[in-house]
A protein has these predicted regions:
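Glycine-rich phosphate-binding loop at the start of an alpha helix
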Residues: 62, 78, 82, 105, ...
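C-terminal alpha-helix plus adjacent terminal tail
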Residues: 1-9, 40-43, 53-55, 160-166, ...
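Hydrophobic/aromatic residues within transmembrane alpha-helices
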Residues: 14, 50, 64, 110-112, ...
C-alpha cells in the first residue's frame, strides 16, 4: 500500500503508508495523496488530515531518490510530487498535517504547504536539497519566505541542518507543537471548529492568502532568469551523478 483513505465525520484522513521507504514520495504515493484529496472534495468532506502511521520513524523523507536516479530530477506541472503539492495548496478544503516524526526535504515542503501543521517534539525538520544541489521553483522560495521569514529560510537552505520542533514552531513552519498523546485530540478539535465555519468563506480565505504568499513579486525578466538557472541545474550531469552516489551509499 502507499496511502490509506478513511472518512470519519467531516474529515477525510489520508495516512502515508510506505514506512519501509521512509514514506518517500514516489509516483504511486504522490498520486494516492492527490487522489485522496480529490475524493474528499467529491464526497463533501470539510477538511483533510494528512498523517503517517504512528509507528513510522520518519514522517516523510521527501522525493523518492530511486525514481530520481531512474528518470532524472523532474520538475514540471505534471510531475506527480509537484501535482500533489499543488493539490494540497489549491484544494478549497483546509489541509491539516499531523506530524509525529522527522520530516526531510520534500516531506518538509508538504508540512510547509499544509494550511495548518500540528507536530510533536520529535518532528524535527531538515531541508536536505542542497546536499545534492536540487533547486526549487521561485514560487516555492516565495512560500518559504512567507512562512518562515527570509533569515530562517536562508538558514534552512544554506546549512541543511535540522530544526527542532520548537524552532519550527517559533519560525512559523508549525502552528502547534503538542505532546504525542495530544496530537489526535488537537487535530480533532480543529476539524470540529472548521465544521462550524462557512465552506465558501474558508475556500476564499485560503485561496487569497495562498495567492499572496506564493507570489514571488519579481519582474518577469528576473523570474525568467531564475527559471533558466533552475532548468540548467536540473539538466546537469552533476546532479544526476550526486543522486546516484547517494543511493549507492545508502545500499552499503
Amino acid at each position: 500500500m502507499t496511502a490509506r483513505y478513511d472518512r470519519t465525520g467531516p474529515a477525510a484522513t489520508i495516512t502515508l503508508d510506505r514506512d519501509a521507504k521512509r514514506n518517500a514520495f514516489d509516483t504511486h504515493l504522490a498520486n494516492a495523496v492527490r487522489d485522496g484529496i480529490l475524493r474528499a472534495e467529491a464526497e463533501g468532506a470539510r477538511a483533510v488530515v494528512l498523517r503517517a502511521n504512528p509507528t513510522a520513524k520518519i514522517w516523510s523523507a521527501g522525493h523518492d531518490l530511486t525514481e530520481m536516479a531512474t528518470h532524472g530530477v523532474e520538475d514540471h506541472d505534471e510531475e506527480p510530487y509537484f501535482r500533489m503539492v499543488m493539490t494540497i495548496r489549491d484544494t478549497p478544503l483546509p489541509v491539516i498535517a499531523a506530524i509525529h516524526a522527522p520530516v526531510l526535504a520534500g516531506g518538509m515542503l508538504v508540512a510547509m504547504v499544509a494550511d495548518i501543521t500540528v507536530a510533536t517534539p520529535a518532528a524535527t525538520a531538515t531541508m536536505t536539497a542542497n546536499r545534492m544541489g536540487v533547486p526549487f521553483r521561485a514560487s516555492f522560495y516565495a512560500a518559504m519566505i512567507a512562512v518562515m521569514g527570509l533569515k530562517k529560510a536562508k538558514e534552512l537552505m544554506l546549512l541543511a541542518a535540522p530544526l527542532s520542533a520548537e524552532e519550527c514552531l517559533n519560525c512559523g513552519l508549525y502552528n502547534h507543537v503538542v505532546a504525542p498523546e495530544a496530537l489526535d485530540t488537537t487535530v480533532a478539535a480543529m476539524v470540529a471548529r472548521i465544521e462550524t465555519l462557512v465552506p465558501e468563506g474558508l475556500a476564499h480565505s485560503k485561496h487569497s492568502l495562498n495567492a499572496i504568499g506564493w507570489a514571488p513579486g519579481l519582474p518577469e525578466h528576473r523570474l525568467a532568469r531564475m527559471a533558466d538557472e533552475h532548468a540548467a541545474i536540473l539538466a546537469s550531469p552533476g546532479l544526476t551523478g550526486r543522486v546516484a552516489a547517494l543511493l549507492a551509499s545508502l545500499k552499503r
